[in-house]
């Protein structure tokens, strides 16, 4: 009889179909011999590699148990900072977007304001700013760039002046989980603003997507050192496991895999976009490893057919 699989592919997880770098796999295997030791040295090596990659001092980097922990700690740190200063605080997010920042803010009893995307699915920066200006307190913006689920970028020439137009009473948490997949030259990492000295900009990234290490939980935050110091007060002290650390270092060093991950995603994206065009289905410009597209007919039926 023909073997069948009951495994369901969770497309909304945006996992990397390539799997991890072979060098990362070997690094994990090699780490078994030292699994009885704490990974302090390996954790330090990840920070050193990231600092070199982004051309910053190591004090700009904070590792997380996946970037979800970095997002949680950043949101919590900024909320507590505002509350300690006896200031009202709230989170402002585009809608739809990745919802972890929203969940963390709500868990702390902080109001969340959702600003609908513009008709073209881009961030409505005017309405986002209006939401902050209508509030007498501290505003934390969570901006996923490229955005999830639209996979669209916000160009630097638009985003950066907009951020700089705010007072220091507004903070910008830029989630760049999919930045390594971006092809559009209009994109520029928010780390540029951090390097310029802005203390109200925090950038998070992950090894889960581009480097296919989702199961090993390695992420990081990049911000000004004094901001990193404040955020790390809300982080676990032992948040990076040995296997994840050695895999992260090996992945950063494997330039061949990085090129393959980027190119294979670009090719796959184009194949899907061509198919959508042939089917007459509209889609948003994609810069991630997923595509936001039109569905004709009943959504529930579509979901059931995708599971079949």
Question: What positions do the PLM features span?
Answer:
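Conserved PLP-binding catalytic core of the aspartate aminotransferase-like
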Residues: 266, 278-307
